[in-house]
Curated annotation (Swiss-Prot):
Catalytic activity: N(tele)-phospho-L-histidyl/L-threonyl-[pyruvate, phosphate dikinase] + ADP = N(tele)-phospho-L-histidyl/O-phospho-L-threonyl-[pyruvate, phosphate dikinase] + AMP + H(+); N(tele)-phospho-L-histidyl/O-phospho-L-threonyl-[pyruvate, phosphate dikinase] + phosphate + H(+) = N(tele)-phospho-L-histidyl/L-threonyl-[pyruvate, phosphate dikinase] + diphosphate
Function: Bifunctional serine/threonine kinase and phosphorylase involved in the regulation of the pyruvate, phosphate dikinase (PPDK) by catalyzing its phosphorylation/dephosphorylation.
A Pfam cross-reference name: Kinase-PPPase
Statement: the UniProt record of this protein carries the keyword Membrane: no
Binding sites annotated in the UniProt record for ADP: 150-157
Enzyme Commission code: 2.7.11.32, 2.7.4.27
Protein name: Putative pyruvate, phosphate dikinase regulatory protein
InterPro entries associated with the record: Kinase-pyrophosphorylase, PPDK_reg
Cited NCBIfam families: PRK05339.1
Keywords from the UniProt entry: Kinase, Nucleotide-binding, Serine/threonine-protein kinase, Transferase
A molecular function GO annotation: ATP binding
Annotated source species: Rickettsia peacockii (strain Rustic)
Kinase among keywords: yes
Superkingdom of this protein's organism: Bacteria
Amino acid sequence: MTKLIIHLVSDSSVQTAKYAANSALAQFTSVKPKLYHWPMIRNLELLNEVLSKIEYKHGIVLYTIADQELRKTLTKFCYELKIPCISVIGKIIKEMSVFSGIEIEKEQNYNNYKFDKTYFDTLNAIDYAIRHDDGQMLNELSEADIILIGPSRTSKTPTSVFLAYNGLKAANIPYVYNCPFPDFIEKDIDQLVVGLVINPNRLIEIREARLNLLQINENKSYTDFNIVQKECLEVRKICDQRNWPVIDVSTRSIEETAALIMRIYYNRKNKYNK
C-alpha cells in the first residue's frame, strides 16, 4: 500500500475538504491515506502552527480558507516546499464569477460574522432531532419534515442528526416486535415517512455488539433471527401499505442514507410545489 499524507486546512470545520479528499481517495484502492485535520484556522498565528506541522510531515494540502492573506501565506509556503496546495472550492467560485459576470464579493470578516437564517434553522433542526429521538414527543410530529421508522439499530438516530445538519427536522420512531405502533400511521400526514430496514444477519451482528458493550446477556429476543426478520418484514409491510419509501441500509453509510432521503424529500417537495 502506498502511504499518502493529506493536510486538511480550513477556517471552519474541515468537512468540505474532508468530503473532497475522501471522494478522491475512493478512486485509489492501493493508497493508505493519513489525514491531518486543521480546523478553525482564522489568523496568522494559528496558520503558522499548521505550517510547521506541514513542514514536518510533507503531504498534499487541501484548504478552504476565505481570508486572502492567509491563503497567500499558505500557498506560498507550499510552493516553496514543492508540495501540492489545492483550494477545494476556489476554482468553483472563479468559474461562477466568470460565467455569471458577477465579481467575487469581499472576503469574509469573522469578527463581524452575521448568523443568518440558515444557521438558526440548522440549530432548530438539531434540537428537534434530539428531542424527537427514539419515539419521543409524538404529539409534535406535525412539525417534522421527515419521520424515520425502523427496527432498533438501523441508524435512525445518526441519520436524523445528519439530516438536521442539513436543516431538515427529522423525528425517528423504533419498531419493536409485538409492540403496538403509534397511531399516527393510521392518519393522513403531510410529512415524508421513510422506513429503514437492514439485512437481519447484519442487524443481529450490530445488536450483539451493542449488548456486549453494555454487558447485557439476558435480552435473547433482541438478537433472535426470527424476531429480527419479522421486525424488518413488518416495517416493509407498513410502508408498502401506505406507499412510503423503504431504504435498505445494509451496505449504506449514514451519509449515503441521508443523501437518498434528502433526494426523495426534495423531489417530493418540488412535485407538490409545482
